[in-house]
From Swiss-Prot:
SMART domains: MADS
Tissue and organ expression note: Expressed in anthers. Weakly expressed in carpels.
One of the record's GO cellular component terms: nucleus
Organism annotation: Oryza sativa subsp. japonica
PROSITE patterns: K_BOX (PS51297), MADS_BOX_1 (PS00350), MADS_BOX_2 (PS50066)
Source organism phylogeny: Eukaryota, Viridiplantae, Streptophyta, Embryophyta, Tracheophyta
Assembly, per entry: May interact with the K-box of MADS6.
The encoding gene: MADS5
Name of this protein: MADS-box transcription factor 5
Length: 225
């Protein structure tokens, strides 16, 4: 029995899709190689995976030569427009290769900084990596110390604000105590409507000497007994 015709559609399962891509890609690259050998054909094959990874095959020493040859061919298109479009394509492709190389380098550097893939590195490269890590640690410590200093400065500023508020509160309490003392002394008068000589003398000393404010209440309690 012959095999039924398989419907071509996107494979929904991610793992199956990746496995199929790998198999079909390898088969396509193999077919391109066989075509170039058996038929002495110039073949160029470019494949991008869903993740943007590049796979390519070229029978010439450089893919650019084949693309340049492709550019020179005219498929019933305006030669100037086709040339400009292809030049843009080639420019974008070269830019992509540069970015791809840069990304791979950064990924390798990141793994090295994390202590991975260190076996291929030479002694000089390991020393350079060590210096980079030490510089990074110095920057981290400097940033941490600066944040600690900022926190200490903020705490001192808040402490000074509390001290100023405490002084202001003490001053207001002292002013209120002085006013209450004067009010009480005005009420302590004799039958004639005048304060006694003893009270007048004490009041005079109390006003002149704030240190007597504390004993004034005890003195008034003694007179009322």
């Amino acid at each position: 029995m012959g095999r039924g015709k398989v419907e071509l559609k996107r494979i929904e399962n991610k793992i199956s899709r990746q496995v199929t891509f790998a198999k079909r890609r390898n088969g396509l690259l193999k077919k391109a190689y066989e075509l170039s050998v058996l038929c002495d054909a110039e073949v160029a094959l470019i494949i991008f995976s869903t993740r943007g990874r590049l796979f390519e095959f070229s029978t010439s020493s450089c893919m650019y030569k084949t693309l340049e040859r492709y550019r020179s061919c005219n498929y019933n298109l305006n030669s100037c427009e086709a040339s400009a479009a292809l030049e843009t394509e080639l420019s974008n492709y070269q830019e992509y290769l540069k970015l791809k190389t840069r990304v791979e380098f950064l990924q390798t550097t990141q793994r090295n900084l994390l202590g991975e893939d260190l076996v291929p590195l030479s002694l000089k490269e390991l020393e350079q990596l060590e210096n980079q890590i030490e510089i990074s640690l110095m920057n981290i410590r400097s940033s941490k110390n600066q944040q600690l200093l900022d926190q200490v400065f903020e705490l001192k500023r808040k402490e000074q604000q509390l001290q100023d508020a405490n002084k202001d509160l003490k001053r207001k309490i002292q002013e209120t105590s002085g006013e209450n003392m004067l009010h009480i002394s005005c009420q302590d008068v004799g039958p004639s409507g005048h304060a006694s000589e003893a009270n007048q003398e004490f009041l005079h000393h109390a006003i002149c000497d704030p240190s007597l404010h504390i004993g004034y209440q005890a003195y008034m309690d003694h007179l009322n007994q």
